[in-house]
Amino acid sequence: DTCGSGYNVDQRRTNSGCKAGNGDRHFCGCDRTGVVECKGGKWTEVQDCGSSSCKGTSNGGATC
């Protein structure tokens, strides 16, 4: 569910599978600028950051 070694630990690829334990956490989507959350087993964008950047941590808590 990560985006590869070139990406930060706070990023997840939108629509990729996620672990159930991450369901209440928010990461930065690496396909586009937005916040993703685990919904229905996949990382789903819940907030579009638009022209703003997304900031996050390795254990979730991402915000625009």
Curated annotation (Swiss-Prot):
Keywords linked to the UniProt accession: Disulfide bond, Secreted
Coiled coil: none
GO CC, alphabetical: extracellular region
SUPFAM superfamilies: Bubble protein
Pfam families: Bubble
Main location: secreted
Protein localization: Secreted
Record-linked InterPro entries: Bubble, Bubble_sf
Keyword Ion transport set for record: no
Disulfide bridge partners, by residue number: C3-C30, C18-C38, C28-C54, C49-C64
UniProt signal peptide: none
Record function comment: May act as a toxin. May recognize a molecule or part of a molecule with a negatively charged surface potential.
Stated name of the protein: Bubble protein
